[in-house]
Regions:
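An N-terminal, well-structured beta->alpha segment
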Residues: 2-97, 178, 183-222
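Gly/Ser/Thr-enriched, mixed-charge loops and adjacent short helices
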Residues: 12-23, 143-285
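Buried hydrophobic positions in well-ordered alpha/beta secondary-structure cores of metabolic enzymes
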Residues: 29, 72, 119, 131, ...
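Short glycine-rich phosphate-binding loop at a beta-alpha junction
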Residues: 62-75, 109, 224-227, 338-344, ...
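N-terminal small/polar loop signature for handling phosphorylated ligands or for N-terminal nucleophile
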Residues: 71-141, 238-312
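Glycine-rich phosphate-binding loop plus the immediately following alpha-helix
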Residues: 153-181, 325-357, 415, 420-424
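Phosphate-binding and adjacent anionic-ligand microenvironments
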Residues: 288-290, 314-317, 337-549, 553-557, ...
């Protein structure tokens, strides 16, 4: 978010504001910001503009019509539907969304506190738009919302026209007389607290039934599962579905304060807590098969496999976190996918296993890019299309038929489907969840990040090690003598000048000063620029440096032949004060 200055006339709302507005930015996961800056006015301006954009689209592209129902829901963050005294009294974001829906000529329908995929699925089935108020996995002091067309998520191509309408709406609303405006000088509704309409439960029921119907005839009987509830909006739904499908479920860890769970960045403290849950449940109930959970808005799964040794007749559990990119492989195999789309950050076990022939070109990171890739696969005639992200959020780009049951396409991240597919794959193959994952190619991943890392610095790091020629997507270094092969995003070889080759070699040499052989890295064999800088080493290590798309964070993704090595790469990356990422940042400053 960055401040805005707009010429104002005396008596206009903009002139009456007692703060400097920070406009929300369009991102691949919607619009997010610090709650202290999320005035109801700012939410309203953006939502009105996005609704106007949806109304401008033809029906076949997900357009909506004035007078239609428009669905909305929220997660369990305090600011989503209540004022938060700890965050400057901001909040009641859902109330601002509801008013924007009304003023855009739509009929708002509150589906309550349900998972993002539950809202999206319900709206798509009815050819209606939707908005989810959520900050997903980010800390509670941040929040936001995500708009869906009647077909699904907004995509990257929508960004420019949406932002143009936001600018127009901002100017129009700021220019209104302050005395007649809905908003006070603090950017909040003059009317104060507003109670939302009682939620309709039909969206929740439909989401539960979606999975009960698809897995009818199959049972999880005999599975003992821990459901880590924390503050996930889908915590009760998760327990309900698992129990209805026959599992014994032990709910644990329920929290009435918001707990940010980033399924792509489970730290040691979180993993230790979940292992404690496993040990306590095992001692009380006997051996458990897995711990399952989701992030805050329940569109990303979290799965911990549990295998047990028995010593003197007593179970000793061994719990292992299963990366979302590996969860996606098991899920797509179970569903019989003939096309799979993943971002470049995913574990490359996919490239080596049973789905390698179904693999479409890897995309940039973010569900809109995965969705665009799935649409390309559909255009090529593929009929069982799946996609997923490294965080485990799983998308279906086509209807999926299995055992004479049909699962309707849901082109947005979902946590419930991968959790269920992993469990049923385990049952069908007569293996524990851990044994099931042990059959995958032996490639191990880990991600970590530095928080409060200025985005401008992150972008400079990426730019420093990126060729100026924008067509270059891949650099291959097949020999140590200095040959370089250049490829574009379609994997077509590019001709290159001597200057291009020298620059590529300089980039490799520069990166080698940070990813040192003394730290276990081999010579650099390839660099990919699909999203950030992804570095491949001759010893099969992979290190990927990328700025977060929606926060001041710099991430490092690692893939290696052992989990220990993947963990070591991320530790080297985020170590303080002299890890690789900090060293890269310092190298930008003149000595």
């Amino acid at each position: 978010m960055e401040s805005t200055t707009i010429a104002t006339k005396p008596g206009a709302l903009r002139a009456a504001l007692n703060y400097e507005p920070l406009p929300l930015k369009f991102g691949t996961s919607g619009r997010r910001g610090d709650v202290v800056h999320l005035t109801q006015l700012e939410i309203y301006i953006n939502a009105v503009a996005e609704l106007e954009y949806l109304q401008s689209l033809p029906r076949e592209e997900g357009g909506i019509t004035r007078g239609d129902e428009f669905f909305y829901a929220s997660d369990l963050r305090p600011s989503s539907s209540h004022f938060d005294s700890h965050l400057g009294g901001r909040g009641e974001i859902a109330q601002a969304i509801e008013r924007a829906i009304i003023d855009a000529g739509m009929r708002p329908v509150n589906l309550g506190r349900i998972p993002t995929p539950a809202l999206t699925s319900y709206a798509i089935e009815r050819n209606r738009g939707s908005i989810m108020v959520t900050g997903s996995h980010i800390p509670f002091e941040r929040n936001g919302y995500k708009v869906n067309t009647a077909r699904g998520e907004l995509l990257k191509k929508d960004e420019v026209p949406v932002n143009r309408l936001v600018d127009e709406a901002r100017a129009r609303i700021y220019d209104q007389p302050a005395a007649k405006s809905l908003f006070n000088a603090s950017g909040m509704f003059k009317t104060g607290h507003h109670k939302l309409p009682d939620p309709k439960t039909s969206g929740r029921r439909a989401y539960v039934q979606r999975y009960i119907d698809f897995f009818t005839g199959h049972s999880l009987k005999g599975k003992r599962l821990i459901a880590y509830e924390h503050s996930a909006v889908g915590r009760d739904i998760l327990v309900e579905i698992l129990r209805k499908l026959g599992a014994e479920v032990i709910p644990t860890g329920r929290s009435e304060t918001f707990v940010p769970i980033d399924t792509e960045n489970i730290d040691d403290a979180q993993l230790a807590l979940m292992r404690q849950f496993v040990e306590k449940a095992t001692a009380k109930h006997g051996p458990v098969d897995a711990l399952v959970s989701t992030d805050g808005d329940s569109d990303r799964p979290l799965i911990i496999s549990v295998d047990n040794d028995f010593i003197d007749g007593q179970p000793r559990p061994h719990a292992r976190f299963l990366g979302g990119d590996l969860v996606g492989i098991i899920t797509a195999e179970y569903l019989g996918a003939d096309a799979v789309v993943v971002p470049i950050s995913c574990n490359d076990a996919l490239d080596l296993g049973s789905l390698k022939e179904a693999l479409e070109p890897k995309t940039r990171i973010g569900s809109p890019f995965v969705i665009a890739g799935m649409e390309k696969a559909r255009a090529k005639g593929r009929s069982r299309i799946c996609g997923w992200e490294a965080n485990g959020g799983f998308l279906t780009g086509s209807d999926i038929c299995r055992n004479q049951k049909t699962l309707k396409a849901l082109p947005t991240r979902d946590a419930m489907l991968p959790i269920l597919c992993v469990l049923f794959a385990s049952v069908e193959r007569g293996l524990s969840v851990g044994q099931l994952f042990a059959l995958l190619p032996k490639r191990y991943s880990k991600a970590a990040l530095l928080k409060n890392f200025p985005r401008a610095t992150s972008l400079k790091i990426v730019s420093r090690f990126t060729p100026e020629e924008t067509r270059i997507r891949d650099l291959f270094f097949p020999t140590p003598e200095g040959r370089v092969d250049f490829f574009n995003e379609d994997a077509r070889r590019l001709s290159a000048s001597d200057a291009d080759t020298r620059l590529a070699l300089n980039i490799r040499e520069g990166l080698s000063k940070f990813f040192r052989q003394s730290d276990g890295f081999g010579p650099i064999s390839r660099i990919n620029y699909t999203d950030g800088v992804r570095i491949y080493f001759a010893n099969n290590d992979v290190a990927h440096v990328r700025p977060s798309g929606n926060a001041d964070e710099l991430r490092i993704y690692a893939v290696a032949d052992t989990q220990e090595r993947a963990d070591a790469i991320t530790r080297l990356g985020v170590g303080e004060p002299d890890g690789i990422l900090r060293s890269l940042a310092r190298s930008l400053s003149p000595h």
